[in-house]
């Protein structure tokens, strides 16, 4: 098999001397050449340790006769940019990470790639990039943080912050992050690590391993070795591995873990790079009868490290195995079914249980695997975790994580309280200007409006209020943190800046939410119910007076993103 790197050496005589100038030896030049791309940087705990894993990957590559070249494009942290204009860059950064992988991989010849990241935009950016360049590739998840004292995890800080603003707690509760890794709850970072493994692009049993575990170093080294192997095999490119069946497997795992709603932005965008169409309807259809099994925060009891101690993605897949496509290929060169059988016999689950016992000792508790990942016949829920709502308010759809929503809010009629920015809305919530029975709207926060930031602080201010958390809804064309809980509906499409119906909502409109029937409608005006025909006529009149907003960003990457971003329900990827 002729390697791309060796063919390019013949075409570009300056390539060899330039590489020797960066530390390659003449012997290295003739080896399998692997790009090792990470989001390493001092940007946040999820990326700060990846340089250590990169060196383990390179060691594994060398052990199998290859040479690994280090590249990186660090990611930003949604947590660090929350509540500032910095959060507007978050979703756009996913596209930039994918773009840099394309540039790095195609500007210089490589035979394979290993990609390392941990967090919200790094993981989907890596997966989009590896799909686009389509060289044999292995993804290495960066793992999760350990929980802190009293089992505190980072998603609780939004709630604590709202309580602090209301004078309910002191400042001491607000400051903590223990170690490297993704935040220790099933937010977007954890969800996307799990999705990478569920798609077959990461080695089995690697998602959400504690970042402090020495086993993570071993897996990184093995990923390097595997990259060299698949570089020399036929039909082991990402496009040979990932199919529609792979995505269906991932979505069923997403249902079982009650994954982040942001996955409805990321999986469709990744699928788009593979030439596969995934829509909100795909999620909704598969979630409707899927088992929800994982009792991990934010919807459950335990920190995310417990997911790995209970057996991780393989343990989830074992429980839902009869619904999965077990014949899909994976980066091991074996099918999913073969991988699951091998893990039963190689001591993987015994090692996980050993870690669980250490966790129990740390907190003086007695948690079992079944407490964390419920057996299939004792599922937490039988209708998945995500619903896509539609109606005259969201013709293209809107997303709710119903497993994190109080059941009394599943069928509601509420009064509309529209705001044209999150700042206005958050101020109203904190000053008690939002009342029981309100449907709070935050609009002009979609991809084209402002980059589609998270409405995390507003959602936490609502859900941490004992009365508001069970009596009002938050509806937006923006998105929510994977840590968000409560009656929150995002991705409302079309977005306001495109003239979607959310832009036409007025104070006092009656809003119908029906989760089980998948409805989101305006059903009344000024507190009075109207027929759907009357509502349509009134909205048509309002549209005549609606004026498109001038584009918010005049230059830079957010100008580019807001000009070309697709609809939230398509994945908000760049459409050129």
Q: Which residues are covered by each model-predicted region?
A:
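Catalytic or ion-coupling anion/metal-binding cores of large enzyme and transporter domains
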Residues: 1-46, 55-73, 79, 85-90, ...
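Acidic/charged coordination and interface sites in well-structured regions
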Residues: 52
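A short, small-residue-rich loop immediately preceding and capping a beta-strand
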Residues: 105-126, 139-141
């Amino acid at each position: 098999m002729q390697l791309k790197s060796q063919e390019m050496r013949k075409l570009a005589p300056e390539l060899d001397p330039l590489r020797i100038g960066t530390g390659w030896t003449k012997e290295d030049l003739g080896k399998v050449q692997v790009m090792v791309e990470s989001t390493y940087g001092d940007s946040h705990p999820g990326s700060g340790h990846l340089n250590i894993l990169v060196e383990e990957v390179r060691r594994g590559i060398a052990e199998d006769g290859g040479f690994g070249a280090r590249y990186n494009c660090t990611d930003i942290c949604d947590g660090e940019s929350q509540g500032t204009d910095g959060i507007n860059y978050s979703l756009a950064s996913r596209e930039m990470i994918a773009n840099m992988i394309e540039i790095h991989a195609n500007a210089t010849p490589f035979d394979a790639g290993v990609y390392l990241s941990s967090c919200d935009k790094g993981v989907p950016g890596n997966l989009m990039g590896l799909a686009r360049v389509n060289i044999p590739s292995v993804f290495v998840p960066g793992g999760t943080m350990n929980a802190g004292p009293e089992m505190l995890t980072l998603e609780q800080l939004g709630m604590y912050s709202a309580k602090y603003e209301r004078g309910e707690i002191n400042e001491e509760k607000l400051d903590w992050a223990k170690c490297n890794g993704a935040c220790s709850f099933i937010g977007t970072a954890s969800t996307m690590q799990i999705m990478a493994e569920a798609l077959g692009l990461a080695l089995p049993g690697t998602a959400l391993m504690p970042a402090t575990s020495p086993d993570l170093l071993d897996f990184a080294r093995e990923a390097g070795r595997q990259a060299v192997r698949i570089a020399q095999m036929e039909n082991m490119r990402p496009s040979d591995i990932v199919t529609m069946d792979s995505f269906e497997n991932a979505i069923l795992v997403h249902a079982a873990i009650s994954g982040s709603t942001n996955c409805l932005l990321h999986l469709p965008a990744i699928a788009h790079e593979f030439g596969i169409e995934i829509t909100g309807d795909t999620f909704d259809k598969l979630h409707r009868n899927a088992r929800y099994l994982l009792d991990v925060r934010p919807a459950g009891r335990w920190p995310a490290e417990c997911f790995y101690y209970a057996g991780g993605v393989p343990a989830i897949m074992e429980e839902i195995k009869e619904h999965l496509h077990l014949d899909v290929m994976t980066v091991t060169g074996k099918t999913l079914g073969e991988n699951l059988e091998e893990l039963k016999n190689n001591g993987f689950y015994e090692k996980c249980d050993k870690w669980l016992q250490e966790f129990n000792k740390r907190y003086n508790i007695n948690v079992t695997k079944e407490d964390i990942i419920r057996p299939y016949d004792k599922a937490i829920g039988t209708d998945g975790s995500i619903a896509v709502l539609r109606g005259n308010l969201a013709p293209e759809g809107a997303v709710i994580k119903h497993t994190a929503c109080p059941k009394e809010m599943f069928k509601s009629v509420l009064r509309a309280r529209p705001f044209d920015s999150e700042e206005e809305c958050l101020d109203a919530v904190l000053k008690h200007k939002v009342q029981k029975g309100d449907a709070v709207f935050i609009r002009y926060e979609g991809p084209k409006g402002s980059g589609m930031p998270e409405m995390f602080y507003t959602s936490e201010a609502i859900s941490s209020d004992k009365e508001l958390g069970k009596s009002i809804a938050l509806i937006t064309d923006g998105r929510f943190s994977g840590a968000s809980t409560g009656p929150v509906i995002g991705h409302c499409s079309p977005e306001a800046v495109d003239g979607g119906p959310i832009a036409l909502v007025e104070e006092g409109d009656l809003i119908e939410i029906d989760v089980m029937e998948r409805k989101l409608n305006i059903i009344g005006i000024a507190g009075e119910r109207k027929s759907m025909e009357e509502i349509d006529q009134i909205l048509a009149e309002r549209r005549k007076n609606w004026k498109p907003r001038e584009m918010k960003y005049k230059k830079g990457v957010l100008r580019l993103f807001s000009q070309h971003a697709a609809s939230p329900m398509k994945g908000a990827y760049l459409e050129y």
